[in-house]
Amino acid sequence: MATAAGATYFQRGSLFWFTVITLSFGYYTWVVFWPQSIPYQNLGPLGPFTQYLVDHHHTLLCNGYWLAWLIHVGESLYAIVLCKHKGITSGRAQLLWFLQTFFFGIASLTILIAYKRKRQKQT
């Protein structure tokens, strides 16, 4: 049987990775939906590369964007299954894992995968 602390286990991920993922997904969203508003000339080496992708591979960018979100949905659902498997039974904790994994993907899921619940000693 899981301990009360184990049943409600939740750990926020690294602020560094959450920042990197948020900025990357934000930029990707900008490129896919509003490519005409991007100041390519002000982005250094990233600007011409992004402009090339927008001009020559926009369909691939769009498909990749939706695939990335689909993967995040899959990771989130797996996080719920993993919560149950690891004895995290609190609905609130499961919701937090689901949301964190949905928005930040593998950066969140690796924390949950690494979690090992404490075993109670049998007397």
From Swiss-Prot:
Major location (coarse):
membrane
Q: Which residues belong to the signal peptide in this entry? A: none
Provide one Gene Ontology cellular component.
membrane
Membrane among keywords: yes
Q: Report which superkingdom the organism of origin falls in.
A: Eukaryota
Where are the annotated coiled coils located? none
Which residues span the membrane? 15-35, 61-81, 95-115
Task: List N-acetylalanine occurrences by residue.
Answer: A2
Question: Which subcellular locations apply to this protein?
Answer: Membrane
**How the protein sits in the membrane?**
Multi-pass membrane protein
Question: What Pfam families has UniProt attached to this entry?
Answer: TMEM254 (PF14934)
| Keywords attached to this entry | Acetylation, Membrane, Transmembrane, Transmembrane helix
Cross-referenced PANTHER family: TRANSMEMBRANE PROTEIN 254
**Name of the featured protein:** Transmembrane protein 254
What organism does this protein naturally occur in?
Homo sapiens
Q: What is the lineage of its organism?
A: Eukaryota, Metazoa, Chordata, Craniata, Vertebrata
